[in-house]
């Protein structure tokens, strides 16, 4: 019975940790950790948008 609880807990941790990777970048810290920069308008030509920083108008951009 203890083994079932341990396996269920492990499964829960794996599935809950993976759910964060499906969401986009939405704050400045996660933008910087993903090697991005916050740009107040749109990303320049040699950068691509990977998320937002503060609001949807502030983009998180990274080199292509």
UniProtKB/Swiss-Prot annotation:
| Tissue occurrence | Inducibly expressed in enteric epithelial cells.
* Transmembrane stretches, start-end: none
Provide one Gene Ontology cellular component. Answer: extracellular space
Q: Does the keyword Secreted apply?
A: yes
Q: Name one Pfam family in it.
A: Defensin_beta
What SUPFAM superfamilies does the record point to? Defensin-like (SSF57392)
Q: Identify the stretch annotated as signal peptide in this record.
A: 1-26
Identify the keywords attached in UniProt to this record, alphabetized: Antibiotic, Antimicrobial, Defensin, Disulfide bond, Secreted, Signal
Paired cysteines (S-S): 31-60, 38-53, 43-61
Q: Which residues form a coiled coil?
A: none
Highest taxon above the source species:
Eukaryota
Where in or outside the cell? Answer: Secreted
Cross-referenced SMART domains, in alphabetical order? DEFSN (SM00048)
Select a single GO molecular function from the record's annotations and give it.
chemoattractant activity
User: Carries keyword Disulfide bond?
Assistant: yes
BP terms from Gene Ontology: cell chemotaxis; defense response to bacterium
**Entries under Gene3D superfamilies matching the protein:** Antimicrobial Peptide, Beta-defensin 2, Chain A (3.10.360.10)
Described purpose of this protein according to its UniProt entry? Has antibacterial activity.
What PANTHER family does the record point to? BETA-DEFENSIN, DEFENSIN BETA 4A
Q: Please report which protein family the annotation says this sequence is part of.
A: Belongs to the beta-defensin family. LAP/TAP subfamily.
Q: By what name is this protein known?
A: Enteric beta-defensin
Question: From which organism does this entry originate?
Answer: Bos taurus (Bovine)
């Amino acid at each position: 019975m203890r083994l079932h609880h341990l396996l269920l807990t492990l499964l829960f941790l794996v599935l809950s940790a993976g759910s964060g990777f499906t969401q986009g970048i939405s704050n400045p810290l996660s933008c910087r950790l993903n090697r991005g920069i916050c740009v107040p308008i749109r990303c320049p030509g040699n950068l691509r948008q990977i998320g937002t920083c503060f609001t949807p108008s502030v983009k998180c951009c990274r080199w292509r």
